[in-house]
């Protein structure tokens, strides 16, 4: 027996009650009572508008994505943080929508979905984008859907084009149920994208859109006490220069502790984690310089772009900081043309293998 949703074949997860068989591996994701419309979509004249021109490299990759989709090929794309990988999917999205096909842009985390939906809805014309995530699922039908990977259970064999951004992000990575739900939602072809793919990609972008190199982090080998004193000194220097600071810590409990410590030194700080309600509100306050510092877990390792932001990583030896996580965190810096570089500081008692691999990878991408 194979579960039609998550593709589970392990018999211990199947349970039959009143002649109905359930898969306990994916039943907690949600019921299957909703059936999206299967009627053919009306062909539209969908277009998009950017306030900037794509670089020659972006245009080249964009054309290749479109050509591969027209040839019914799946594609994996590795693009360094800040390469502008979202924008290079617009041509293939436009093509699919104008063919009357159904398109999904999916990513593992709700915060990324909210950011993406706001951005794409302002750039795409003549199409209403349906946004679906936990707590926001009143409307789930549509031709162009942006959703978390958890919500794909609603769409069996539904999408002609599915774009998965950050496929190596928690909670999707190594999650057999979510992987199965995603595969089951595709009836056409997919594009998988990330800055930290481990397998050889079909397409590769090693340069940021503005042409500047990736910032290489500096490691400070120090004890916890000295770490805090050094970090506070750095943050004060940044604040004087009106530079916002993202401080990463490995646990939720530490976000609150560190934010309180910073407040003792008259720094306007706030803690962000998966427990935080209305994360976007605090990100906007941070973006508009109403906060000096956001102390965050790895929930903000991806998908956040703040102009002129500086990054500090505390307790860099913690196991939560994998090579991929560190590369993504470092990629928060220098994403805007006005401020294409910045400071990344890792405070740790010693260099872990992940830190060494992060440094090696960034230097190789810059070569």
Regions flagged by a language model, labelled:
Residues 40-43, 197-238:
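Interdomain hinge/linker at the junction between the two RecA-like core domains of SF2 helicases
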Residues 2-42:
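Interdomain "pre-motor" coupling segment immediately N-terminal to P-loop NTPase/helicase cores
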Residues 173-187, 319-341:
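Conserved SF2 helicase motif VI
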Residues 159-165, 301-317, 343-346:
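A short beta-strand element within the Helicase C-terminal
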Residues 149-192:
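SF2 helicase catalytic motif II
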Residues 187-199, 207, 330-361:
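Conserved segment of the helicase C-terminal RecA-like domain
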Residues 77-86, 96, 101-116, 236-262, ...:
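Conserved strand-helix element at the start of the C-terminal RecA-like helicase core
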Residues 114, 118, 127-140, 270-297:
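Conserved helicase ATPase core of P-loop NTP-dependent helicases/translocases
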């Amino acid at each position: 027996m194979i579960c039609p949703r998550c593709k589970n074949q392990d018999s211990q997860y199947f349970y039959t009650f009143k002649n109905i068989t359930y898969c306990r591996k994916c039943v907690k994701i949600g019921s299957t009572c909703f059936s999206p419309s299967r009627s053919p979509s009306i062909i539209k004249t969908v277009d998009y508008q950017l306030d900037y021109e794509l670089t020659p490299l972006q245009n080249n990759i964009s054309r290749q994505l479109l050509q591969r989709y027209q040839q019914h090929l799946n594609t994996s794309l590795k693009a360094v943080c800040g390469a502008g990988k979202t924008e290079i999917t617009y041509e293939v999205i436009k093509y699919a929508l104008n063919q009357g096909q159904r398109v999904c842009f999916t990513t593992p985390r709700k915060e990324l979905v909210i950011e993406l939906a706001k951005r794409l809805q302002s750039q795409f014309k003549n199409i209403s984008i349906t946004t679906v995530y936990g707590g926001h699922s009143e409307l789930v039908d549509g031709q162009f859907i942006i959703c978390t990977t958890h919500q794909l259970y609603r769409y069996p064999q539904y999408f002609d084009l599915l774009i998965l951004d950050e496929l190596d992000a928690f909670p999707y990575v190594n999650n057999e149920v979510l992987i199965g739900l995603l595969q089951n939602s595709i009836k056409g072809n997919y594009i998988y994208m990330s800055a930290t793919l481990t397998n050889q990609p079909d397409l590769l972008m090693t340069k940021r859109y503005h042409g500047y190199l990736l910032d290489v982090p500096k490691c400070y080998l120090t004890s916890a006490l000295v770490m805090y004193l050094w970090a506070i000194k750095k943050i004060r220097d940044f604040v004087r220069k009106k530079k916002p600071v993202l401080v990463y810590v490995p646990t939720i409990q530490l976000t609150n502790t560190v934010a309180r410590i910073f407040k003792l030194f008259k720094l306007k700080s706030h803690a962000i984690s998966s427990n935080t309600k209305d994360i976007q509100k605090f990100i906007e306050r941070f973006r508009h310089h109403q906060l000096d510092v956001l102390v965050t877990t790895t929930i903000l390792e991806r998908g956040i772009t703040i102009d002129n932001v500086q990054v500090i990583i505390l307790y860099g030896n913690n196991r939560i900081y994998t090579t991929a996580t560190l590369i993504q965190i470092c990629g928060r810096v220098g994403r805007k043309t006005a401020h294409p570089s910045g400071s990344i500081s890792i405070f740790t008692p010693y260099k872990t293998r992940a830190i060494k691999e992060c440094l090696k990878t960034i230097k190789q991408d810059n070569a």
